[in-house]
Amino acid sequence: MAQLIFDEEKVTSVIDRIVKRTFQMDFAWDWPGGVAFYGVAEAYEATENEEYINLLKTWVDEQLEDGLPPLSINGVSIGHTLLFLHKVTGDDVYLETAAEMAEYVLHKAPRFGEGILQHTVNAAEYVFPEQAWADTLMMAGLFMLRIGRVMEREDYFEDGLRQFHGHEDVLQDPVTNLYYHAWDNKAQNHLSGIYWGRANGWAALTMAKALPLIEVTHPSFMIIDGSLRDQLSALVRLQDESGLWHTILDDPDSYLEVSASAGIASALMSSGKLYTKYVQKSLAAILDAVEEDGRVSRVSAGTAVMKNAEGYKQVPYKRIQGWGQGLALTFLADVLKTKKRLYQ
């Protein structure tokens, strides 16, 4: 397989434009910032641009002056940034705050079945009883694995694994190997039963990021690796000629969506050179989707589990979104990192 080909200077410049535009947005302690800042942290790891640390630190420090707000699964996503800041600054306040969030997840967050987290959001008026959403893997599942490793807390780590296994059990179709957006445990169905693009982006990206945290001799490694392997095999067969994926993966009449594509393309890179030809096409398309001012375009708005396919098709995609910025940064950072590691 051919090596991934790219202009390192161009990719670095595009990353910088995205980061700068991201910090012209206003964020609360919620998932738009959580995903955006995850991407900024990844951008730092790839570029070592110290400005990115300062931007994140300034935002978090200002928020922490008021203490933690009431938490939800979506709000826990900021925990990724706290772990990053603890790593690069050594300041224990970030880890202590992240631990508070992990305690919320472990002991207070609503669950159902075999300990699967119910997806919860910051807005109290929106409640989804006993629903599992693929989004939770990014907001809380991966976070629990990461903090479990950092703090050597097996209970946190095992809960992270529980989320990956539980969400696979209820969301991954055993025939298509794609992930549904959500599962309703009360109704015992997948609601509208849609293979939503960003849901598959969340699942693929987080599994790819989870595997390096798990010992290869741990049974969970094989379970997650198998789920990801089969999902990626299905996803590459649905990639559009443009290099992007549709917001409804198996519906070519639905629009092409960039945040899902970035998450999927990043996950494809975890397989080394196996999927280089697909990643190469995605790279060109995602770079093209970044406006001159750093806005990542063609990113769908925050999406509840819609009632039908038409509902997903009507979700707007004209505005800047934190998750679009963050997922594009994550992908482009992974592209740059191929210069620093064995890619085979």
From Swiss-Prot:
Optimum temperature is 50 degrees Celsius. It is stable below 50 degrees Celsius. It is found in: Cytoplasm. Catalyzes the hydrolysis of unsaturated rhamnogalacturonan disaccharide to yield unsaturated D-galacturonic acid and L-rhamnose. It cannot act on unsaturated glucuronyl hydrolase (UGL) substrates containing unsaturated D-glucuronic acid at the non-reducing terminus, although the active pockets of YesR and UGL are very similar. The active site is at 135 (proton donor). It is an enzyme of class 3 (hydrolase). GO terms for molecular function: unsaturated rhamnogalacturonyl hydrolase activity. Monomer. The lineage of its organism: Bacteria, Bacillati, Bacillota, Bacilli, Bacillales. GO terms for biological process: carbohydrate metabolic process. It comes from Bacillus subtilis (strain 168). Induction: Up-regulated by growth on type I rhamnogalacturonan. The record marks 31, 74 as: May be essential to modulate pKa of the D-135 carboxyl group. InterPro entries: 6-hairpin_glycosidase_sf, 6hp_glycosidase-like_sf, Glyco_hydro_88, PolySaccharide_Degr_Enz. This is Unsaturated rhamnogalacturonyl hydrolase YesR. Optimum pH is 6.0. Its EC number is 3.2.1.172. One of its GO terms (cellular component) is cytoplasm. SUPFAM superfamilies: Six-hairpin glycosidases. Keywords: Cytoplasm, Glycosidase, Hydrolase. Substrate binds at residues 30-31, 74, 118-128, 198-202, 308-309. It holds the Pfam family Glyco_hydro_88.
